[in-house]
């Protein structure tokens, strides 16, 4: 990434460990190309939902969490910081994920998979900025502290414009 790009979009996960690993690989690419360290902007991509109730916020985006898990772990789990105890569940997600239902809102098979496989909390923590305004602010701060230059969110839920409004007013505004 860093050897050829000016900006790299990262969707490998939002934990500090995963972000630092991704950024390290980008910086290695910069060094190979003779670029100044930090010349490549790092953007992170996150599924987002905000609510006064964390469980409600997560419930509304389970299908998107399953989609992120399906995408990120499609070819291998090697080097992807997946806990050993979740590897079999991730393998089942890969086999049973239904592309025809990709990110459809509501009670879909893909939404149910994350709960059935006990992956919901892991996928939410890894791929989303989701929960109460306080929880979302904390997550945004940790993403920034890991070295990310820009956070791109996709508002997922029954009312995306309300998610964007609340995110701007209750998460981004207070973090400045």
Spans of features found by a protein language model:
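C-terminal helical cap(s) of enzyme catalytic domains, especially alpha/beta-barrels
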Residues: 19-29, 160-176
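Loop-centered beta-sheet repeat module
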Residues: 2-30
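An alpha-helical appendage that flanks or caps ligand/catalytic pockets
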Residues: 24-145
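Structural preference for beta-strand elements that scaffold enzyme active sites
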Residues: 7-9, 39-43, 149-152
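Active-site beta-loop-alpha junctions enriched in small/polar residues
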Residues: 13, 45-49, 156
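Structural motif
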Residues: 3-4, 146-148
């Amino acid at each position: 990434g860093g050897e050829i790009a000016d900006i790299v979009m990262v969707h490998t996960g939002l934990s500090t460990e995963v972000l630092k690993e991704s950024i390290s690989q980008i910086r290695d690419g910069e060094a190979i190309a003779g670029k100044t360290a930090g010349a490549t902007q790092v953007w992170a991509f996150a599924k987002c939902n905000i609510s006064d109730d964390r469980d409600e916020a997560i419930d509304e985006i389970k299908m998107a969490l399953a989609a992120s898990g399906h995408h990120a772990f499609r070819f291998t789990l090697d080097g992807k910081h997946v806990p050993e105890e979740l590897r079999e569940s991730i393998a089942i997600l890969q086999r049973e994920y239904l592309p025809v239902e990709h990110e459809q809102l509501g009670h879909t098979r893909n939404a149910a998979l994350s709960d059935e496989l006990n992956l919901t909390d892991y996928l939410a923590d890894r791929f989303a900025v989701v929960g109460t305004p306080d929880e979302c602010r904390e997550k945004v701060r940790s993403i920034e502290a890991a070295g990310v230059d820009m956070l791109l969110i996709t508002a997922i839920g029954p009312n995306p414009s309300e998610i964007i409004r609340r995110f701007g007013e209750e998460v981004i505004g207070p973090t400045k």
